[in-house]
Amino acid sequence: MDEGETLKYKNTQIGFVTGAAGIFGMLVVYYGTGANAGALGLFDTVMLGFFVILTALFSTLTVEVTDRTFRFYFGPGFWKRSFPLRDIQGVKVVRNPAYYGWGIRYTFHGWLYNVSGLRAVELDIRSEGTIRVGTNEPEQLRKALEQAQQPVA
């Protein structure tokens, strides 16, 4: 958060399915390669490391609204995106089709950033277009964005 900004809203959504899939992948690599017998090779070590990193980076999605900025990031700060509130031209709560999945992907509605569930907030951002950010609290996020955009009396 930049100096002088006031945090108005923050929520971290945990992607239980993505986290479980990552852990499952680690177990498959570990036990499927005979590592429990002490036979973990270079490829197996790389694959295990890949699943550890992937799980750590994409198992949570945090959204923040300050008095000036909307930002979100995966895991401990990976893939951080930030937009000035003045550039947000529209906000609405949406439901994504199940086939949109999770992660970072381009859809018919613009970029989607999601770790769990089907609910999201769709933002129309000047010079960026439309993006969707998944959240377990879409109404609260929409309200926080709208309130933060109101002029201070």
Identify the function of each model-found stretch:
Residues 45-46, 53, 123-124:
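Short hydrophobic/aromatic segments of transmembrane alpha-helices and their interfaces
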Residues 49-90:
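Conserved beta-hairpin
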Residues 1-37, 112-113, 118-120, 128-130, ...:
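N-terminal membrane-targeting/pre-transmembrane regions
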Residues 147-153:
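Generic C-terminal helix-cap and adjacent flexible tail
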Residues 73-136:
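Non-transmembrane, membrane-adjacent beta-strand/coil modules in membrane-associated proteins
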Residues 37-47:
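Hydrophobic alpha-helical transmembrane segments
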